[in-house]
């Protein structure tokens, strides 16, 4: 596992995996591409923060 270094910038994006990430860097670090800006809709309500913690 390589550690990703991302800023704490809050610019939520919806990942291709249906997870809301706090920013594009975090989505990329988790192997997801950005589906669109803003939180995901129509999926379980959870997101991954800069610590890699999943919040539901």
UniProtKB/Swiss-Prot annotation:
InterPro entries recorded: Kazal_dom (IPR002350), Kazal_dom_sf (IPR036058)
Kazal-like domain segment(s): 1-42
Protein name: Bdellin B-3
One MF term in the entry's GO annotations: serine-type endopeptidase inhibitor activity
Record key words, sorted: Disulfide bond, Protease inhibitor, Serine protease inhibitor
Cysteine-cysteine disulfides: 4-29, 6-25, 14-40
Purpose of the protein: Proteinase inhibitor. Blocks the activity of trypsin, plasmin and sperm acrosin.
Top-rank taxon, per record: Eukaryota
Site entry: Reactive bond: 8-9
Claim: Disulfide bond is one of the keywords in the record: yes
């Amino acid at each position: 596992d390589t550690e990703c270094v991302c800023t704490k910038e809050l610019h939520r994006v919806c990942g291709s995996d249906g997870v809301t990430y706090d920013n594009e860097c975090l989505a990329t670090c988790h192997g997801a591409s950005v589906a669109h800006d803003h939180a995901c809709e129509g999926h379980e309500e959870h997101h991954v923060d800069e610590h890699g913690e999943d919040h539901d």
